[in-house]
Amino acid sequence: MISRREFLHGAGALIVSFRSAGHGLLQETHGRAGTHASSMDPDQLDSWIAVHADGTVTACTGKCDLGQGIFTAQTQLVAEELCVSLAAVKLVQCDTAVTPDQGSTAGSQSTPTNFNVQDLALAAATAREALLSMAAEHFGENASRLSAKDGAVTAPDGRRVAYAELIGSKKFNLPVDQHARRRSRNEWTVLGKAVPGLDHPALVTGTFEFVQNVRVQGMLHGRVVRPPEMGAKLIAVDEGSVRDIAGLAKVVVREDFVGVIAETQFAAIQAARQLVCRWSPGPLLPPQETFFEHLQQLPSRDELLVDSGDVSTSLAKADRVLRARYTWPYQMHGSLGSSCAVADVRADQATVWSPTQSVYPTRSCIAMLLNRPPESVRVIFVRGSGCYGLNGADAVSFDAAVLSQGVGRPVRLQYTRQDEMMWENFGNACVIEHRAGLGQDGSIVAWDRENWVANRGSRPGYDRPGNVISGMLLGYEPESQEPAPAKPPTRKLRNGSNTVPEYFAGCAGGACNGSGSVQSERVLTHSVASPFYTGPLRSPLRIQNTFANECFMDELAAAIHADPVEYRLRHLRNERLRGVVMAAAKAAQWESSAGRGAATGSEATGRGFACVAYEGDNGYAALVADVVVHRITGVVRPVKFTIAVDCGPISNPDGLRNQVEGGLLQGTSRALVEEVTWDAKRVTSVDWEGYTSLRLDYEVPAIETVFVVPDNVKATGAGETSITVTPAALGNAIFNATGARLRQAPFTPARVLAALEAGQEARSA
């Protein structure tokens, strides 16, 4: 195994191939690893930065680029803080042998983690100041009189010394300075520029190498054989049923896990199809048509996020009380390419090439599955098909490692489309109920919110391989979902899942951390057992909650014939959220939308509004959606999105714009067409006919984006802000166009027509 020192010494050659091949892209992650930390001490500068004899710089990060563009943005960050050119920086991402442990790439945390005063940016700033100090000694000058630029330090009299001459290929042997000076925005020469994606040339020319392209000498091919239905248990495997297949290497059976290994992909596919397994039947699945009612009847683990204690009394005194119930289906990641990993498990060392968003947690879980210490496992991130959440990336890595251990040779495993779509961790199904009381002037005087969330599993973390299907089949249990009653809230509200509407004061734990003014408030959540595996899908629970919160806010405004924007501003106190609300309304030339919808022939037009303080303080967005609804077919067609986003200082406007626009389109797909289906035994949406998403020939609406950048604020996440507000804005636009309120996503043509018919019947009654 190559040592980190050898790796960094040869980085000038190695990273070029990493960049062009795509083997080094960043992840979004939550925090540090604590007791699971890597051998790279995050408090030491040498864990992050190395300057080479040729003047190039290697920077190591535990945040990987999954397609969201942070490879480019964080290369800019290092170049800016170190005062070197963009071309001089070689960024290494997510390799447990060489990069620090920054947890998982998730939650829109990559930029907050590495951009703000910590981790990568602070390390680069520390390195710059250390080099200035070395140059001061070299020149016999005071460091404050020196300037750094283009990989060199210049003295007032014009003398110049290159970084390579000061330290080239040697270690800094310094701690990361928590007080190192960060370069201010008015000093930026690389950050803040619309630099095209550094991986784009390889992507558009077809030379980018995804994990599916990884090849290892002596590699075999694997396939897994999953149970035929949910909850089935393995009884027996007839290995004789595949003995006639040429090139078959081994059948691996462990607990309920079954896999085959062969010399060729074709032979592995044949063996997986032909292998005879006997399974016990699983329990019947709840009927899909009554699933949400079923969900609300299950035992639950309850939590009170806020509870002022007076909601019932305030509702009883209100001039008017409105109620609504919203539902959100299971949805899947729907990655275009199925998950793939390559594992090489030897007696003393295991290496896994994986598309995981969590290299160190994945290393820990693989070590558990292989019954060996984590230090003997190396996980190297290689980008897979687009995900932003938890598709089969972790599970396929576990499977590949177990198969490789079983045969003693490298194994490449790629899931079938059915493996992927039947067994991935779906986005959670939810039921959300609102009750709100209005005063005589129409303002909200009390709001009660209750939701039910279907949960089973999640990210495996460092010690929960059973949170995905592979670990469960290998004998590990997912996180406990034992029912428990709610206790009075004692923690301060952070609103990480946007469960609490933006208009609540959010008082808990001795502080009011909400964005709004409603002080008679209660939010009760029920976590119930899901029949399917669940986990993070871009904007996990945030999109579900914001859909319900923002559509209900629109209902309240409509009930008193108030302008939706004015009504929101009436109840908002957070200045950054108010800022994007006003910016979006101004850009869209918003006028009073009460009764604004118009109809011409079979088409009705309307516009809707929605806003969010993502996770309470991790990005702010407000969206105006203009739509056309065909009243004969029920088809909803967005024609324009106008969005305002505040994510603080912007590393790369081009990359941010890509994230915002991509989020709007994915949000449109999830709002209009995406839904997992099942029968009594299994998931039935296991191909692109059964699971619909926006097609490549979809007519993309016009998009106008406004960036709001307040002074003196920290960088926040951006990758999940726009998707979060899209379904609510579309639902509100449909109502504005037709008078029909859709409370169940997705807004399929059948549901739109049913809502139109119900509205017509109500008006005729």
Predicted feature descriptions by range:
Residues I2-S20, E28-A765:
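Cofactor-binding beta-sheet edge motifs in enzyme active sites
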